[in-house]
Amino acid sequence: MLTAAGVSAVDGNYRLRAGIWGEFLDSLVMHYGGSDSLKTGWVSNVLFEPAVGNDLFHRMAAAEPLLTVKHGTAFVDARREKGRWIVRTEHAGKTETVEARVLIDATEQGDVARALGVPYDIGMESREATDEDIAPETANGIVQDLTYVAILKDYGHDVRIARPEDYDPALFACCCANPLCTNPREPNRVWSKEMMMSYGRLPGGKIMINWPIEGNDYYTNM
């Protein structure tokens, strides 16, 4: 999420500099020249360019002698055998087998856990199950909106491309306050374009567009 997905703004834990997070944060500070250099937008105190974060994660991984990173690897299946995990993957067109005492599912959607029959829920749990006031009274299957984040660069001059044939400005008319916004879905949350652009401003003249107000959230369901 912090690199390839473009959401290079970290929520909270600014003062809990420990473990992998502490190592990554310290590396960002060294790269940009200080903690204040990461406070470029108002959504977070830790903002950075995705490419920089990607480079730092690769350096951290490369420094570990017992860690092997294989990009472009897909999970096939796993089984438990004589107290060990036997995991099959596909890499570079070939099937590979890994044996381990511990298996951690770090896939985005829990592919390994699902394949092994681990119970799971989809959607919002009920208030009775969580004892949280913010939860719905009854459970439902609604999942969090998908977001296609965009990283823009401020060139300091007009670099607009030719208007695409199917472009419909009405879809995003109310992402911020402007004359085209006449019927907003959330009248109390129509903020200025300056607020939208400064929300995820990154170092290096970049801007993260991760805007939930009639912006780039895409609602769908399972």
Task: Give names to the regions the model predicted.
Residues 14-16, 77-84, 156-167:
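Generic structural signal for short, solvent-exposed loop/turn connectors between secondary structure elements
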Residues 42-43, 48-50, 85-86, 181-182, ...:
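Mixed-charge, polar/low-complexity N-terminal
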Residues 1-77, 81, 121, 144-149:
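Conserved N-terminal/central alpha/beta ligand/cofactor-binding core
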Residues 2, 71-72, 91-102, 106-222:
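Flavin (FAD/FMN)-binding glycine-rich loop and adjacent Rossmann-like elements that form
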Residues 79-97:
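Conserved beta-strand-loop-beta-strand element in the redox core of flavoprotein oxidoreductases
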